[in-house]
Amino acid sequence: MRTRALVPAVVLMGAMAGCGATTTETITAPQIEQYRIVRIAVLPFMVAPPTPGQRRGYAAPAPPAVSGDKLADLFYFKLNLREGLAVVPPPMVRETMPSITASVASRSLLRDLGERLDVAAVLEGTVEVYQERKGSAIGLERAEDAAAVGFSVRLVSVKDGKTLWTGEYYERQRPLTEDLSGFLERGVRFLTVEQLANSAVDKVLREFPLGRQIQRMQGATSPSP
């Protein structure tokens, strides 16, 4: 049984200590049920601009531009499987408002989008980390060669611009000796960044407050990139 949020609920999962630990945080606004949301739109996700360190090569590379589309598509695919929730995909949002991004500028723009698409809320997101695995599925030379994913998402009401739910995630896959449960859950292998992103979205959406999650048949997968 899913736990309903009666107060702003903060959910922290995974080991928090040590470099490369997995962190997941979701917050649900206590008044979300008052909005009676049954139809939402997934906006095209933004990609965080490179930091000075990334531009100079001192830090991990900035996420590639395509990572925004990949994460937005993953969220759409998984949310669209839920009962009791209709979801408008990012391409339809772009077609309706070509200039819109994940960072909506004003309430009037939100209301306009809501009227055009007949949605009560939008899901917007930003990709901060999207690093591909360097090496094979069976072994890496260095721990930092593992795939890494980090993103934040928000569900925003088009009526008043209030944030009704947020989700944040970061993970650099750790070796078997540090993350036995992760390997048991996802298989004894080092994941590609797309596989890690797929798992990350599943974990964040465990606490998504709208719709009912349908148990997928064994072997069902997300669409290929």
Where does each model-flagged region fall?
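Bacterial N-terminal signal peptides that target proteins for export
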Residues: 1-8
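C-terminal/domain-edge helix-coil "capping" segments
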Residues: 19-41, 47-50, 113-117, 132, ...
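N-terminal segment of the mature soluble domain
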Residues: 38-39, 43-128, 156-158, 162-166, ...
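Outer-membrane beta-barrel domain signature
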Residues: 100, 140-142
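Extracytoplasmic/secreted cell-surface and envelope-processing proteins
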Residues: 132-138
